[in-house]
């Protein structure tokens, strides 16, 4: 069975993604979904799948790393089967937190979405005020998904050190980078058994073509190289100003 699938978006990538998240929530019988809580530096636990329509994984701002907040959040529902919606950097951090024994990652259904980049908080607020609605910034970032999202030089400082903006390592990984998102998104699962459990053959729009998968991976490779050069340039600059 394929572990790479597509979702046809019909011009609405956010609505399509949220509906897919709601579907897998209901199919896996989650008790809740942990998401970032808007501008607040805290996690938020959704307990009704109908609330999924209010979240926006493409929102280009990040006030805290959700993985660092999860251990405390999970104490609220110690016996619950929960999902968590993460950016790639948060997924990597979650693995580290789990390896330190701060939480049991196997009690979570992890969902990771390609990151289109984030602005510094003050710039995000300024741009939102100019556009009159912060949702416009998410839509703008999505427009540039085929090219890699917002430009690296506009990222907040932490994002400039990012290893990769590609969704990887979660049980459900959603691809948007390098793709014509008004037409299609990709779904990647590392476990064929989960694909069968979710019945992806019916809730998706079929297996992803090798060309589409390669298209995303090619852009991710270029983005990772760009990020590496950016990190090296920043570190070289620091080396020049720090005392020897």
Per-range role (PLM):
Residues 1-243:
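Iron-sulfur-associated redox domains of electron-transfer enzymes in respiratory
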């Amino acid at each position: 069975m394929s572990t790479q699938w597509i979702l046809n978006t019909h011009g609405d990538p956010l609505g399509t993604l949220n509906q897919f998240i709601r579907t897998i929530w209901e199919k896996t019988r989650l008790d809740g979904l942990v998401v970032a809580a808007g501008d607040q530096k805290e996690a938020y636990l959704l307990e009704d799948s109908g609330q999924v329509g209010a979240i926006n994984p493409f929102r280009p701002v990040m006030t805290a790393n959700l993985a660092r907040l999860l251990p405390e959040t999970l104490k609220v529902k110690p016996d619950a089967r929960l999902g968590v919606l993460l950016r790639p950097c948060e997924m990597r951090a979650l693995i580290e937190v789990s390896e330190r024994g701060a939480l049991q990652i196997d009690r979570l259904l992890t969902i990771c979405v390609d990151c289109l980049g984030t602005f510094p908080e003050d710039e995000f607020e300024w741009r939102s005020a100019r556009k009159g609605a912060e949702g416009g910034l998410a839509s703008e970032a999505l427009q540039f998904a085929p090219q890699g999202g917002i430009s690296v030089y506009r990222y907040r400082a932490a994002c400039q050190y990012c290893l990769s903006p590609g969704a990887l390592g979660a049980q459900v990984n959603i691809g948007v980078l390098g793709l014509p998102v008004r037409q299609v998104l990709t779904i990647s699962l590392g476990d064929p058994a989960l694909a069968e459990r979710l019945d992806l053959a019916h809730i998706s729009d079929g297996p992803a073509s090798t060309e589409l998968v390669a298209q995303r991976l090619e852009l991710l490779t270029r983005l990772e190289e760009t990020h590496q050069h950016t990190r090296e340039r920043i570190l070289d600059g620091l080396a020049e100003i720090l005392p020897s």
